[in-house]
């Protein structure tokens, strides 16, 4: 599943414009893409797509700086940006240390520690059939290392 900036997609009942794409490689060799999304009210969300593992997560920034009660650590490691397109605030070669937590209902809490900031997000694991491309759009330049 791959989208380009300018595409319109539907995730569950929400419609979004894809504004950017970041490709990552984890220190364990895993690869995945994250898409920056904007809904009609201007809110930003992120769609993480790992086709290899069959994992799809829609998340949004949160002010919570610690995992909520009932969440358990399920992945910890580092990620390296391998490619970008559209409007994103990272470059190929940037790295972060990450911790992902999950609760029994499939909610995800993530922490990404970059050189210049720490980001916290809450999300939900999705079935891939809940992610639908509505229309294609322009293709922004792709940068990778």
Q: Which residues are covered by each model-predicted region?
A:
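Mixed-charge, low-complexity intrinsically disordered regions
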Residues: 1-145
